[in-house]
Amino acid sequence: MKHSEKNEIASHELPTTPLDPVLAAGRES
């Protein structure tokens, strides 16, 4: 079950998340 946890963390650690375009745009600004 550690793989699942790593996957979740990686998804949240992604610099540019497709689910959060606003966040990505704000970071790019």
Swiss-Prot record:
Annotated spans, Disordered: 1-29
Major localization class: cytoplasm
Keyword Coiled coil: no
GO molecular function, one term: 3 iron, 4 sulfur cluster binding
Keywords of the record: 2Fe-2S, 3Fe-4S, 4Fe-4S, Cytoplasm, Iron, Iron-sulfur, Metal-binding, NAD, Oxidoreductase, Plasmid
A single cellular component GO annotation: cytoplasm
Cofactor note (record): Binds 2 [4Fe-4S] clusters.
Bias-annotated ranges (Basic and acidic residues): 1-11
Cofactor(s) needed for function: [4Fe-4S] cluster; [3Fe-4S] cluster; [2Fe-2S] cluster; FMN
Taxonomy, superkingdom: Bacteria
Entry EC number(s): 1.12.1.2
Entry's family note: Belongs to the [NiFe]/[NiFeSe] hydrogenase small subunit family.
Protein name stated in the entry: NAD-reducing hydrogenase HoxS subunit delta
Species in which this protein is naturally found: Rhodococcus opacus
Primary gene name: hoxY
